[in-house]
């Protein structure tokens, strides 16, 4: 996602070099890039990042603590406003059109979210919008959550002491449906 681009260091180059397609997961950064969060507002209960799940709470704290992620969200929102689409559609389109990405999985808790996000499959961001998003979200080594600390902090929650919450699926209203968007070859 625009909020977590560490795969660009090795995974995408390796996939391109070996002609391997990638399945992108969590392109909305667990909902952070949906446009539903504001600086200083925190996560509302009933949202994925506002759930009682230790894992999503840690992920949310990581996203909310990053000045770069807030700048990225502002960039996504600005481009969405200019294009007359939603921030979710911009974030989904950006991920789906990354090099080597052949499919994208995203989640929707409600039918409204699903219906709002589906048009992203037909949205093609222009070069200028893509360049702006690339610039504002550019990964930097060891800059959480762009580097290994984001993964190690989530992995640390999977220790036996926290296993009951970290490895359980969120209950309603944090649950939902995951969808797979497949890009046609050559599109």
Question: Where do the protein language model's features map onto the residues?
Answer:
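Beta/alpha (TIM)-barrel catalytic core signal, keyed to glycine-rich beta->alpha loops juxtaposed to Asp/Glu
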Residues: 1-136, 159-160, 171-175, 179
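Short, intrinsically disordered C-terminal tails of secreted or membrane-associated proteins
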Residues: 178-186
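Serine residues within intrinsically disordered or low-complexity segments
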Residues: 168-171, 187
């Amino acid at each position: 996602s625009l909020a977590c681009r560490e795969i660009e260091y090795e995974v995408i180059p390796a996939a391109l070099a070996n002609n391997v397609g990638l399945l992108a997961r969590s392109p909305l950064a667990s909902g952070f890039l949906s446009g539903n969060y504001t600086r200083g507002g925190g996560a509302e209960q009933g949202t994925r990042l506002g759930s009682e799940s230790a894992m999503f709470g840690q992920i949310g704290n990581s996203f909310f603590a990053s000045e770069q992620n807030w700048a990225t969200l502002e960039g996504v929102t600005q481009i969405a406003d200019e294009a007359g689409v939603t921030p979710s559609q911009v974030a989904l389109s950006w991920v789906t059109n990354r090099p080597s990405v052949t499919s994208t999985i995203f989640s929707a808790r409600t039918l409204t979210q699903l219906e709002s996000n589906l048009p992203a499959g037909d949205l093609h961001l222009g070069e200028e919008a893509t360049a702006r998003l690339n610039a504002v979200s550019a990964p930097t080594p060891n800059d959480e959550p762009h580097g290994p600390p984001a993964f190690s902090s989530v992995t640390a929650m999977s220790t036996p002491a926290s296993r009951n919450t970290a490895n359980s699926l969120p209950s309603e209203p944090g649950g939902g449906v995951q969808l797979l968007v497949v890009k046609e070859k050559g599109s």
